[in-house]
């Protein structure tokens, strides 16, 4: 995944794929600045401190996530690596003037898996809104089918063997400055106006989405 690279041997904070104000009015520049420049950066910085001098230091980010998953001894490494990966994936799941109709290949799978594109969007929104506490809602590919899954805290569908296509961050820091406790408003606006269905379609059938 291009969301993170190794550099002597640290994991780098990826550049945002758009300007900080590009997602307004759904996500303000203020929220994006704090979310990316403080929260995401902290996960990357903490991870680099944790892996320095360990076998993880020579691994790409996705491999760290998979190697540390389920290990109590490496819980801190997993949490920070997964959050770094999840956030990089989240930024690419959004785009200015997004939403709308998905590409044909993705639409066919949405129709086959959920009955319609609208039904898929509704299930994704429901999952995101109903996730208890912090976490993520994901559109994933599982074999020939698409599914909606929720993960708590830092967890990722990669730990469950599914292929992520698109994600929504429902940690409060993703929306609280703009929406306070109105998570549903954030989720619905994101799906309607920012969802990057082209990115989701690009990830179909790929082992390492990018």
Predicted segments, located by residue:
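Feature for soluble, non-membrane regions of globular proteins
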Residues: 1-210
């Amino acid at each position: 995944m291009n969301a993170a690279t190794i550099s002597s041997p640290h994991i780098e904070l990826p550049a945002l794929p758009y300007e900080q104000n590009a997602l307004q009015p759904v996500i303000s520049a203020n929220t994006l600045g704090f979310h990316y420049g403080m929260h995401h950066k902290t996960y990357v910085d903490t991870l680099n401190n944790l892996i320095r001098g360990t076998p993880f230091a020579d691994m790409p980010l996705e491999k760290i996530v998979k190697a540390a998953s389920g290990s109590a001894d490496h819980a801190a490494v997993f949490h920070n690596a997964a959050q770094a990966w999840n956030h990089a994936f989240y930024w690419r799941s959004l785009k200015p003037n997004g939403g709308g109709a998905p590409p044909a290949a993705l639409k066919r799978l949405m129709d086959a898996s959920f009955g319609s594109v609208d039904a898929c969007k509704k299930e994704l929104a429901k999952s995101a809104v109903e996730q208890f506490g912090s976490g993520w809602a994901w559109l994933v590919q599982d074999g020939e089918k698409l599914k909606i899954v929720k993960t708590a805290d830092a967890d990722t569908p990669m730990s469950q063997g599914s292929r992520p296509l698109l994600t929504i961050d429902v940690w409060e820091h993703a929306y609280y400055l703009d929406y306070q406790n109105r998570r549903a408003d954030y989720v619905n606006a994101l799906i309607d106006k920012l969802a990057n269905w082209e990115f989701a379609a690009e990830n179909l059938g790929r082992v390492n989405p990018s």
